[in-house]
Amino acid sequence: VSDGSTRALSRHLKRFSTSVDNLESDYLLEFFENVIATTPDTGDWFPRIEFREQLPIGEQLFFRLRHAPVRTQTCILWSLDELDPRQNPTVKGPDLSACQKLRRKANLHGADEAVILDGDGFIADGALSAIVWWRDGVLCAPDESTPWLPSITRELVFELASQAGHDTRTERAKPEELANCETWSLSSLQGIRGVTSWQNIPMGKHKMLNSFRKRLMMLSEG
């Protein structure tokens, strides 16, 4: 949230709703309304809503108002050197602590984000972001053969690409197969970040980055 403007808020709330479908809709709607009303109209914020299943019904939803961390236009990636530790990779929340640890591990290697690979070395997801790349003018992302969290930002970026006349596809790819490809890390906080370094893999130039960052920013609504 930046000065009261958000991007695809309804999609984020819908994704949260589908992951807690055992809650009454009226209770959930009232909670969402309180979250929106409580979030300030000025400043940069990174609100977080939580569902704690172990608590009594009626006391399971929590709202945390957090200041937004610093945003950057580029980032450095590091491939995780262990098996995917996520237990529920297609639902946002249950694996958050584990993914935060992966990012901290990437930081120790001089990177901003860890990239999770499947058992065969194919790209699955970023620890706290979605990974996409441009190959021969086509915007690509991991396919359904690897588990990845449904990313609202990935969804929006793919829509923007299609609207601009670009082809999109999903595919299986290993990090080294992205040599000389323009590669991005996507998240609701950072938007689109161009990857400048990924261990010893040469990264492609950021030919599409600025135009897509501008288009994504234009989707923000007050």
List each model region and its residues.
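Dinucleotide-binding Rossmann-like beta1-alpha1 core, especially the glycine-rich loop
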Residues: 48
